[in-house]
Structure formats: structure tokens, C-alpha cells
From Swiss-Prot:
Gene: rplM
InterPro entries in the record: Ribosomal_uL13, Ribosomal_uL13_bac-type, Ribosomal_uL13_sf
Similarity comment text for this entry: Belongs to the universal ribosomal protein uL13 family.
Record-given protein name: Large ribosomal subunit protein uL13
Keyword Ribonucleoprotein tagged: yes
Species per Swiss-Prot/TrEMBL record: Bordetella avium (strain 197N)
């Protein structure tokens, strides 16, 4: 029996919606990264993007355990010399509610062109509304 290798044009992708209200950031991010990569499917192939589309709603209500809301640091650079800036999880959630989950998932995906294509299938929204109802996303419980 020959080993099955998925081809990009043969992959079928589903749409899933995840309600992140009250869920822990890392647990949601690891499951989302797994599904974006396609590891939950029997036809998973490492060099082909076999993952599904994921819509995350209520990203503003995601939580972290312990004192991570003050202790977890996010860094960015302004591209000027000495321009490193840092912020914590709490301030990041106030200013950009979906960015923390997006950065967490992006860090769990492979780096390179394949990983960049995978992260484009993640849609994050701070509130309960999303514009992807036409795709009829299935609810996913974590």
C-alpha cells in the first residue's frame, strides 16, 4: 500500500467558530494551531496546508491564569535605534483585544511560507459578531 500524500488542490477546508469567552489563552491557542495546521485530519501532510478556517469570537474575554495579566510581556520594535517597546497582557487586551491570541497561535505554527499561509486562515474578533456567516461555520467546543 502506498503512503497517501495530500495535494493542495484536493484539500477540503471546513469553517469552525470558537467562542473564547472565559477560556484560557494557551489552551485555545494550541488547539487552534493544531487545526490550522491540519493535524486533526487523517490526510495530514507536513508540507501541504491541509488545515481548516477558524473564526474566534469574544477574543476580548479570553483569560490567562495566575499573575500573567501583569507579568506576561509582549515586545515590539519601532525600527528606530533603541526603539524596543514592551507592554503586558492586560494593556494589550485593552488596546488590541484580538492580538494576544493571534500572537500566541502564530508562535505555535511553523515559520516560513507555509506558516504564513496558515495564519491567514485565522480570523479573530473582539465581540460576538463576525462577518463569516455565509461560510456557515460549525461551532467548536474546547
Amino acid at each position: 500500500m502506498k503512503t497517501f500524500v495530500a495535494k493542495p488542490h484536493e484539500v477540503t477546508r471546513d469553517w469552525f467558530v470558537i467562542d473564547a469567552k472565559g477560556k484560557v489563552l494557551g489552551r485555545v491557542a494550541s488547539e487552534v494551531a493544531r487545526r490550522l495546521r491540519g493535524k486533526h485530519k487523517p490526510e495530514f501532510t507536513p508540507h501541504v496546508d491541509t488545515g481548516d478556517y477558524i473564526v474566534i469570537i469574544n477574543a476580548a474575554d479570553i483569560v490567562v491564569t495566575g499573575k500573567k495579566s501583569q507579568d506576561k510581556k509582549y515586545f515590539r520594535h519601532t525600527t528606530y535605534p533603541g526603539g524596543i517597546r514592551e507592554t503586558n497582557f492586560e494593556k494589550m487586551q485593552e488596546r488590541f483585544p484580538g492580538r494576544a491570541i493571534q500572537k500566541a497561535v502564530k508562535g505555535m505554527l511553523p515559520k516560513g511560507p507555509l506558516g504564513y499561509a496558515m495564519i491567514k486562515k485565522l480570523k479573530v474578533y473582539a465581540g460576538a459578531e463576525h462577518p463569516h456567516t455565509a461560510q456557515q461555520p460549525k461551532p467548536l467546543d474546547l
